[in-house]
């Protein structure tokens, strides 16, 4: 996901301990069943009653202090529809507390943005970190505050041990993962599939490539790739690697216990090149993909005169579909699990952790609210969001597709694999234009250079892990 990182010895051990319990595939079979079972996604139950949610709960689940006259600042990576949806959550906090909250987008390099703010003496009150490693880095520097008793109570009540552990460090709870992501989903344009005579979604990588060729032959750009944003390319690699090499190797590469020159990486890159090396299967070809940012990769799949047929990315794709296209999730836009490359289909999870950078009552109150079912249900009603909050009312989700994805996440409990690049040092796994992001962009540009890509990735990783 949009990422950044830093690693320490204790963090590495936690990634293979608590984060090993906090880093595995959601049950792919169960996910496949729930996605297959998704209907039209109209947000109604069998009686026709609206169950999609629409704002705050009828009764508040958390008590908040009065903060009249206070102005808070919250920073996160989101822009466009994701920012608009989150703003509705902030509006409810303002209504209940009397505070004013200003949202500041960080850009893709979240850690760099926040570091500059903090070192300049002007940190936001609350920030969302897209990477668990940055939480550790900031905690070591004393830049973030442990959760207060009210926020801790919400975390203890609403989140499983695995998600709690991801927000903890050296025995203290610093943050809460209030936004999760299933990053092993392929979204498809049903009209393009129908026009090409395709009635079944692919289950394996070979089937996926065959489906892409059929779509291309029928006149549809098969796969839309947002290659201008390097984080999307890391997600492609992680899904292939997890399915092909398996969870043990995945954990080892995530902690740099094996090198990027390992044969398993060669195999994954070679597999990825089966798609990335075919211009006719990519919307705009490789050059076009490298000039396409993530939001456009979604909109060009569900709008325009010649839309692409498929786009890979997480559940948050629905936010862009809902806001920027006329397509209806569950009807015009459907989804299937990332195809199995090895014995099992992968499911990679990601998320954003809310942390307090200031010690005041306002920052703690906002984190407390964000940890509540109230905030989760308001956010869920907007679409493009799933929550690891196990106590929230899943009927509040905007559409049936997202609701079933969220239920699969909750059903997995603590059994999930976390985004690999989000476990790496910031300089390798989470900064635009360098490290893994740049390495995979170069590989998309020249998919024949597997060995050269491996060498460059290993050189960048070795430097980043040594310094991190």
Label every model-predicted segment.
Residues 2-35, 39-136, 378, 452, ...:
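Conserved N-terminal structural module of periplasmic/extracytoplasmic solute-binding proteins
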Residues 4, 385-386, 391, 406-461:
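C-terminal capping/gating helix-and-loop segments adjacent to ligand/active sites or protein-protein/ligand interfaces
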Residues 60-66, 132-184:
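Hinge/lid segment of periplasmic solute-binding proteins
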Residues 64-66, 148-159, 227, 244-267, ...:
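Short, solvent-exposed loop/beta-turn-alpha elements that line the ligand-binding surface or hinge
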Residues 105-113, 132, 205-210, 286-300, ...:
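Short helix-initiation/N-cap motifs at beta->coil->alpha
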Residues 174-178, 184, 209-258:
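Extracytoplasmic/periplasmic solute-binding protein
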Residues 247-323:
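Extracytoplasmic ligand-binding clamshell segments of periplasmic binding protein
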Residues 322-386:
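Extracytoplasmic/periplasmic substrate-recognition and gating elements
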């Amino acid at each position: 996901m949009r990422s950044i990182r830093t690693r320490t010895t204790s963090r590495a051990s936690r990634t293979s301990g608590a984060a090993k319990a906090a880093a595995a595939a959601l049950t792919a079979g169960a996910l496949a069943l729930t996605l297959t079972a998704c209907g039209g996604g109209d947000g109604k139950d069998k009686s026709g009653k609206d169950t999609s949610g629409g704002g705050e709960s009828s009764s508040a689940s958390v008590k908040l202090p009065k903060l009249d006259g206070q102005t808070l600042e919250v920073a996160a990576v989101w822009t466009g529809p994701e920012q608009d949806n989150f703003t509705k959550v902030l509006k409810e906090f303002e209504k209940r507390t009397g505070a004013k909250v200003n949202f500041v987008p960080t850009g893709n390099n979240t850690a760099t943005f926040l570091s500059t703010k903090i070192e300049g003496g002007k940190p936001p009150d609350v920030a969302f970190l897209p990477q668990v490693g940055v939480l550790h880095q900031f905690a070591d520097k004393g830049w973030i505050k442990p959760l207060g008793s009210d926020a801790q109570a919400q975390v203890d009540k609403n989140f499983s041990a695995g998600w709690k552990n991801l927000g903890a460090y050296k025995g203290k709870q610093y943050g809460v993962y209030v936004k999760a992501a299933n990053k092993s989903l392929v979204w498809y344009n049903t009209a393009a599939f129908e026009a090409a005579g395709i009635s079944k979604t692919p289950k394996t990588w070979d089937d996926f490539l065959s489906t892409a060729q059929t779509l291309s032959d029928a006149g549809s750009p098969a796969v839309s790739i947002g290659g201008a944003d390097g984080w999307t390319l890391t997600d492609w690699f992680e899904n292939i690697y997890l399915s092909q090499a398996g969870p043990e190797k995945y954990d080892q590469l995530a902690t740099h216990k094996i090198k990027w020159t390992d044969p398993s990486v060669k195999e994954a890159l070679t597999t990825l090149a089966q798609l990335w090396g075919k211009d006719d299967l990519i919307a705009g070809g490789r050059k076009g993909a490298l000039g396409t940012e993530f939001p456009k990769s979604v909109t060009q799949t569900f709008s325009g005169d010649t839309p692409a047929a498929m786009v890979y990315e997480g559940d948050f794709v629905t936010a862009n579909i809902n806001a920027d296209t006329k397509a209806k999730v569950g009807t015009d836009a459907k989804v299937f699990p990332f195809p199995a490359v090895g014995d099992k289909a992968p499911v990679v999870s990601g998320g954003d952790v809310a942390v307090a950078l200031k010690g005041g009552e306002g920052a703690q109150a906002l984190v407390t609210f964000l940890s509540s079912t109230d905030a989760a249900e308001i956010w869920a009603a907007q679409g493009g969001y799933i929550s690891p909050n196990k106590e929230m009312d899943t009927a509040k989700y905007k559409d049936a597709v997202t609701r079933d994805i969220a239920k699969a996440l909750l059903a997995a409990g603590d059994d999930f694999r976390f985004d690999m690049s989000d476990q790496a040092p910031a300089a390798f796994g989470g900064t635009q234009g360098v490290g893994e992001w740049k390495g995979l962009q170069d590989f998309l540009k020249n998919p024949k250079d597997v060995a050269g890509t491996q060498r460059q990735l290993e050189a960048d990783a070795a430097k980043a892990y040594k310094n991190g």
